[in-house]
């Protein structure tokens, strides 16, 4: 039986790669074919574009939310981690869904490598580079799908 507040293992999730200027968003499900990049949300001086986030939430109706936890390579805290945790708390309050944190170390590097491969194969163009944040979010969702027990439930 899943832990109270945990995301259903067969549920649909939205994943987030939180940055200071943009937030990548992806959707995934254990019943589907992994994860898919779906949006890049702008972050303004007063915070993320909640209207755009509300639209994505309404479109996908997730059972839970997965936020990348940006630890340093030596497991230390950093400003990006505080920002990601604050965003995760805002998501939980706004949507009343379970929110988990998953280690996102090297997710942006992995997304950049995928983008480079897809570009070399002719499936992506240079102008598609903005979608890199959403591709990083897809990596985060795939990590959760592969090992949901490695996620930390947002306290």
From Swiss-Prot:
One Pfam family matching this protein: RuvX
Keyword tRNA-binding: no
Subcellular location: Cytoplasm
Record EC number: 3.1.-.-
Keywords: Cytoplasm, Hydrolase, Nuclease, Ribosome biogenesis
Class in the EC hierarchy, top level: hydrolase
GO BP: rRNA 5'-end processing
Gene3D superfamilies registered for this protein in UniProt: YqgF/RNase H-like domain
Molecular function terms from GO: nuclease activity
Metal-binding recorded as keyword: no
InterPro entries for the chain: RNaseH-like_sf, YqgF, YqgF/RNaseH-like_dom, YqgF/RNaseH-like_dom_sf
GO cellular component: cytosol
Family, similarity comment: Belongs to the YqgF nuclease family.
Job of this protein: Could be a nuclease involved in processing of the 5'-end of pre-16S rRNA.
Name of the protein in its database record: Putative pre-16S rRNA nuclease
Organism: Xanthomonas axonopodis pv. citri (strain 306)
Lineage summary: Bacteria, Pseudomonadati, Pseudomonadota, Gammaproteobacteria, Lysobacterales
């Amino acid at each position: 039986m899943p832990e109270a507040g945990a995301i259903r293992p067969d549920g649909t999730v939205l994943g987030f790669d939180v940055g200071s200027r943009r937030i990548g968003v992806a959707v995934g499900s254990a019943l589907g074919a992994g994860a898919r990049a779906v949006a890049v949300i702008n972050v303004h001086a007063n915070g993320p574009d909640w209207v755009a986030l509300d639209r994505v939430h309404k479109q996908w109706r997730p059972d839970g939310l997965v936020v990348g936890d940006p630890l340093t390579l030596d497991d230390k805290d950093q400003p990006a981690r505080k920002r990601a945790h604050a965003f995760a708390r805002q998501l939980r309050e706004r949507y009343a869904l379970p929110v988990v944190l998953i280690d996102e170390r090297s997710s942006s590097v992995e997304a950049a490598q995928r983008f480079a491969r897809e570009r070399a194969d002719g499936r992506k163009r240079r102008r598609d580079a903005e979608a890199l944040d959403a591709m990083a979010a897809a990596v985060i969702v795939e990590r959760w799908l592969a090992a949901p027990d490695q996620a930390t439930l947002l306290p």
